[in-house]
Amino acid sequence: MLRMDTVHRDKGQVVILKKTNYLPYLVNLFIPKLFYPEKIVVARLYINVNKHDKHAAENFKGTETPCFDVPPSLFSDKVPMDKIVFLPTVMLPMGFEAGGVFGPGVLTRRSYPIDLKAAGHKGQTPPLFVGLRMDIQAPTRVKSLLKEVRESQPAQDILMNWVRASNNLINGEQPKEQELRDEFSLSMVFNLPTPPSPPSPYPYGRIPLQFNIYTPDLSNVLLLMSHQRDLTVAILSTVNNPHVPSVAFAAMGDEEECPKFELPLSAFPTFEGVNRPMFLPKRFMPKGFEAGCVLKPGALSDRWFMDNIGRFGPTQPQHNGSITPPLFVGKICREEPTVDMIRNIQLEIEKKASEDATLPAVKPKIDISITKGFMVMETAAEDPKPPKGAYSVQSYEEAFDDGCVVKVAKKVATEATDTRGRDEIRTSCDQPQEKDEGSAEADKKHLSCFHVDSDIDNIAMAMARMGVADISLPAEGEAMPGIDGDRALIQLSHVLEDRNQIRSHTDQLMQDHIFRMNRNRMLALRQPFTCIGCGTQENK
């Protein structure tokens, strides 16, 4: 669909309908309902959908149809403007005061709009509709509410702009247009801001469309109206007011009563079957209403919207724009005092702004520390510089605070071979001197820590310089429940000693996997596969 500005049409500009080779009925053609004063819309038609109406061609041939001057700048090449067929008013889409069609094959490929032509299209060019929108004059209330609203603004800014624009109505300015109807008044739906829902793991899920029943929860909805009648109608949005199954169960159940009333036959048609109005329980209705019902999407015809509120109703986002939007019809409660909704919205915005301005900074309740170390190593006093890839610490407490769980120290070798003598030496000599030598030994040793992601080659080389190293877990068994400390140390020693064999074995496994994938792919394509090792060819 293309749009263009600066097109003017006189009200009495008409033409005699002579050529009726292709005259489609485009009342059901859906084009987004937006306020486009004096703008042209160009839309592609489909022959199998927008078929030629023979009866309309016979009836309207020779009659006057509204027309306008189609600007040549719409097309990239010369176009036979005399071959456009202007449609009667009753055959135009809703919201257009004039429009015509170029039949199939009338426009050349060079003159047909590129954006509307399908890629790789063959055959004659499809028909094209060129229409002029009505010069829509919205009510003063709608203009004042929508004056400063922009799509790019966040929801909070839109809310404030609506209230700021509505202050003129509070000061006594009333709309000068005549009432649309005496049976009901037209309202604008305003949804109060709700707390954001947690993000869904499936953000692009398919949105279910409800065609059989539509029961939204309108308890958090305000209806703004310029004048008050016993009944009011408002266009709902399937996006902002989605179908709620719990409301449907409550409306069709026997647990609570749904207040009902009769819709005036002078304003509404007779509803039957699935199109009948669904009356809501009072707890799901907006404030200030004693009864209310909802008409599902598609229950009312386009003609009804056109004759009643179609061109004056505020636009609402819909999941399906090819059918008419849902409608709320409510009966105002006269017994309750009148609620100044605009004032309530202003107070809510001021309260929200004051809360945001005085909101203190939230500090984390738990200090989540990031593990820095993995292994603490004692190095000799002769080499105070930490090994490659490690950093120095002052004490074991500092190393354990950094997250070290493995302790490596140089193992002192003894010449005694008798186990009993070794035990006697350990029990008789080592234990009494442990406390005395502890402080002196700590002064002679330097502590270094390795990160969890340190290079394993650097760790192994540092341990190799120590000679015979003793690996231990300083943490007790209660501090590591469910962990076999001895087995973990054996596995760590195996990884440090046989790291090259582990790497070569892993590399061989990857090469074997690549070989099998290539072999299976070639055999699946029925191509001979040559084995690299033996040189033989395999055929499937």
From Swiss-Prot:
It comes from the Eukaryota. Residues 417-443 have a biased composition (Basic and acidic residues). InterPro entries: DM7. Residues 416-443 are annotated as: Disordered. Keywords: Repeat. Belongs to the DM7 family. This is DM7 family protein GM11956.
